[in-house]
């Protein structure tokens, strides 16, 4: 590794640690000639993944695009930046581990929804509203009702059933309009 200060190629590694969920290695080095210390990163070079979009065009997988979409969905929620980064890393790792080098944007969207559903319901609905291309309030209400139904089925908390405070499922969009 070439020293960024004196360009000498001899250095010694002082410390190494895994970063980015094991996807890279951070090394702290010291130049043997000028004694300056510097940090280097070793990253795995992945085979590029192509994303097949709805309009049948292809583009290279763009991690920053995935991150932006998830950040936008998680705005003003309790989801931390670290949690968002973890989701992006996990999705990217799953894509890289797949033997397929071409994936549809719909498949990526489904992966994001799986993670957001566990992380935060508001972020899930926000992402679903863009990804699912809701045509109107009816689509939105149907997704909310589905979430609510699944939550009821998975909830076995005695406090919930004893409290009698079960939320009302909205049956049609006219009720939403009237209550607004």
UniProtKB/Swiss-Prot annotation:
Could you list this entry's UniProt keywords, alphabetically sorted: ATP-binding, DNA-binding, Metal-binding, Nucleotide-binding, Repressor, Transcription, Transcription regulation, Zinc, Zinc-finger
Q: Where are the zinc fingers (unnamed)?
A: 3-34
User: Which InterPro entries does the record associate with it?
Assistant: ATP-cone_dom, NrdR-like_N, RNR_NrdR-like
What this protein needs as a cofactor is: Zn(2+)
Bridged cysteine pairs (disulfide) = none
Q: Which GO terms describe its molecular function?
A: ATP binding; DNA binding; zinc ion binding
Give the cofactor binding note. Binds 1 zinc ion.
One Pfam short name: ATP-cone
Chain ranges of the ATP-cone domain: 49-139
Region annotation (Disordered) ranges: 148-180
Instruction: Name the GO terms of the biological process aspect.
Output: negative regulation of DNA-templated transcription
Question: Polar residues bias: where?
Answer: 171-180
Q: Which family does it belong to?
A: Belongs to the NrdR family.
Q: Which NCBIfam families match?
A: transcriptional regulator NrdR
State the protein's purpose.
Negatively regulates transcription of bacterial ribonucleotide reductase nrd genes and operons by binding to NrdR-boxes.
Protein name (Swiss-Prot/TrEMBL):
Transcriptional repressor NrdR
Give the gene symbol. nrdR
